[in-house]
From Swiss-Prot:
The organism of origin for this protein: Thermosynechococcus vestitus (strain NIES-2133 / IAM M-273 / BP-1)
Stated name of the protein: GTPase Obg
Main enzyme class: hydrolase
GO MF: GTP binding; GTPase activity; magnesium ion binding
Domain of life from the UniProt record: Bacteria
One GO cellular component term: cytoplasm
Quaternary organization: Monomer.
Signal peptide from the UniProt entry: none
Length: 333
C-alpha cells in the first residue's frame, strides 16, 4: 500500500432547506392561516479519527466532499428533513489545517475523536413563523442558508512512542521486524525503506508500544535531500529516539553526528528528545573491535552505547530494558 502523509481536500456543508409559503386549505375553515413549514438544516462535514487507517491514500484522488442539503419545508407546518452529516474517516495522528488561513483546526490523535470542519446551513423559516397580531397572513418565507465551505490541508504524523533513526542501511527495518510483527522490505542497500514502518513491540506486562522505523535520513535531510525531509515529521510525536549506527561503518562517530545534526537543524524539539544509542551489526566484528567502538562512541555522545545484532538477535534484551526504563515501563526480573 502506498504511503501518503499529506493531502488537500475541499469540504462543503449542505445548504439549509428553504422555508415555504403555504396556507391552510381545509373545508369549513374559510380563512385558514399560514402553514408553511421551516426548511431542514443542511448536513455538516465531520472528520473522524480511526485506528484502521495508516495513510491518507484515500484522499489522493478524492478531493471534494459535500454533505447533503436540507429539504424544503412542507405545508401544514411540516419541517423539512435535515441533510445527513458527512463523516470522513482519517488516520489517528492527522492534523487538520485551514489551507487558506494556515490555522490549525484540530489534531486527531485518539480513535473516535471527531472534528467539525464545515457546519451545515440553517434551514429557512416558513411563513407560519411570521404570524403575529399585526400580520395575520404573512406571504413571505426565508430561504435556507448556505453551508460552510473550506479548503483543508491534512498532515499525518504517525503516533509512535519510539522512533528508530539512523543512516540508510543501518539496519532499522531489520530491527523493527525482529522486535515486532512488522514485515518491512529488507535488503542490503540504502533506501530500501521508502515509507515509515510501524511495529508494535510487547512490553514485559504484555501491553504494546508502537515503534516507527524512519527511512531516508542523510546529511541535508532537513533541506529536502534524500527522503528524510518527507518523514522527519513522523518522529515529532515520539517520546524516545533509538539511534541505530552501523558498526561496520568507516566512522561511527561521523555517522552518529550526521543524524544528530539533522535532528537539531529540523527543530521541533527533536534535538532535545531523549535517545538511546546502539551499534548494530556487531556479528561482523570481533569482541575487541566492538569494545573499542563502544568506548569511542560512548565518550563522544556522553552516554552508554549498546551493542546489538538485529540479524543474529544479539544484545536485544538489554536494549529493550533501557527503552522500557526510559518510557517508565516496569521491568520485572
Amino acid at each position: 500500500m502506498q504511503f501518503i502523509d499529506l493531502a488537500e481536500i475541499h469540504v462543503k456543508a449542505g445548504k439549509g432547506g428553504d422555508g415555504i409559503i403555504a396556507f391552510r386549505r381545509e373545508k369549513y375553515v374559510p380563512a385558514g392561516g399560514p402553514s408553511g413549514g421551516n426548511g431542514g438544516n443542511g448536513g455538516s462535514v465531520i472528520l473522524k479519527a480511526v485506528s484502521n487507517l495508516q495513510t491518507l491514500l484515500d484522499f489522493r484522488y478524492a478531493h471534494v466532499f459535500k454533505a447533503e442539503n436540507g429539504q424544503r419545508g412542507g405545508p401544514n407546518n411540516r419541517t423539512g428533513a435535515c441533510g445527513a452529516d458527512l463523516v470522513i474517516e482519517v488516520p489517528c495522528g492527522t492534523m487538520v489545517w485551514d489551507a487558506e488561513t494556515g490555522e490549525l483546526l484540530g489534531d486527531l490523535t485518539t480513535p473516535g475523536q471527531t472534528l467539525l470542519v464545515a457546519k451545515g446551513g440553517k434551514g429557512g423559516l416558513g411563513n407560519k413563523h411570521f404570524l403575529s397580531n399585526h400580520q395575520r397572513a404573512p406571504d413571505y418565507a426565508l430561504p435556507g442558508l448556505e453551508g460552510e465551505e473550506r479548503h483543508l490541508r491534512l498532515e499525518l504524523k504517525l503516533l509512535a512512542e519510539v522512533g528508530i533513526i539512523g543512516l540508510p542501511n543501518a539496519g532499522k527495518s531489520t530491527l523493527i521486524s525482529v522486535l515486532s510483527a512488522a514485515r518491512p522490505k529488507i535488503a542490503d542497500y540504502p533506501f530500501t525503506t521508502l515509507v515509515p514502518n510501524l511495529g508494535v513491540v510487547r512490553q514485559p506486562n504484555g501491553d504494546g508500544t508502537v515503534f516507527a522505523d524512519i527511512p531516508g535520513l542523510i546529511a541535508g535531510a532537513h533541506t529536502g535531500l534524500g527522503l528524510g525531509h518527507e518523514f522527519l515529521r513522523h518522529i515529532e510525536r515520539t517520546r524516545l529516539l533509538l539511534h541505530l549506527i552501523d558498526a561496520t561503518a568507516e566512522d561511527v562517530v561521523a555517522a552518529y553526528q550526521t543524524i544528530r545534526d539533522e535532528l537539531v537543524a529540523y527543530g521541533h524539539g527533536l534535538g532535545d528528545r531523549p535517545q538511546i544509542v546502539a551499534l548494530n551489526k556487531i556479528d561482523a566484528l570481533d569482541a575487541s573491535q566492538i569494545t573499542t567502538l563502544q568506548e569511542t562512541l560512548a565518550a563522544y555522545v556522553g552516554q552508554r552505547v549498546f551493542a546489538i545484532s538485529a540479524v543474529a538477535r544479539q544484545g536485544l534484551e538489554p536494549l529493550l530494558e533501557a527503552v522500557w526504563q526510559e518510557l517508565g515501563v516496569s521491568v520485572s526480573h
